[in-house]
């Protein structure tokens, strides 16, 4: 439902496409801020406690939309979005690694894809609820979405509170990742120095991404006073953080121990791939309605476009279900690479504005991006043993990509058109494809699903 709110806020609050992207920023900011605390609490509370904590926070966020509708200010809605995302962070950081250790290690990617497929049910019905409550009209044709926006979120809060009772009573085994291989076995074959060098380079790239993310947070504060401050604050803050982080990395590079999860290139590469995947996904989801109301040969209305988003998410769900079988038959990292390459071509077709063919490509992009998040997650924590919980927190933090790229897409769409803005997800999918194709070169091993015990970050 969050992604279909953008068009609603554009019209009700008179926002540009780039300004409405603060919805995605608030959503993924919640993930970014809570990822590490969620991972830390998960180690203290266990799987059950972490899941219950996440569900309670989601319920609080959903109920906040009731007073937010009365306040009727953009910041109030953004706060509710951020609270829900913070709760979801607990679920991502706890439930995903829990899924990977519930069965045979070789099928971890398959299990996590099947579990994630359940999300598709919510994705399908979410846009339908959005069409009913965000874009509803009265008998005279006047929009009533401003008064009814809180209803679906309150409904979600009630359901989530019922789930809290279920998890509080249901038996849940507290499993741990097996440690089947010595730490040295998870490295890249060949010169250990080259492995260390690759790990250091990928860690530096992660610091670049982190610097941009912190720059965006500074921008969120600065643009409260003036939208014109966006680019100066972003560039200045990013450069400052990158300089500081680079100096720290340079001084501490010799202290990167073999036991650190950051010494594993396949993990540090996964955080980058996850950043770019979520960036691409968030941008496509956020501007789907804008695309459907302006770009096809026969544009549709807001409510119809919101309903069509359900078709896109149905494609997403189908991709998850089919993809779970595909990654079971073929190497998960190669499937990820191929799917990423296909989405590069699909985004290129959208940019070329080929009429209905481009519109179909948007729906196909939903299908082929479907397996990326859980597959990157499973590949990233492969071989990390008990370090998987900490690694999961960083992989969830990488979701911050979804807060940054929609702003860039929005600026391109405002200055040109929505079709051209698909160059942003195109570049992101290139990065995902590269990670998939080169995963084994980064030290990933299908036979190694749990290696590092009590890793030090």
Locate each region found by the language model.
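Central cavity-lining transmembrane alpha-helices of secondary-active solute carriers
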Residues: 22-40, 310-322, 401
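Conserved MFS/SLC helix-loop-helix module at the cytosolic interface between two early adjacent transmembrane helices
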Residues: 33-75
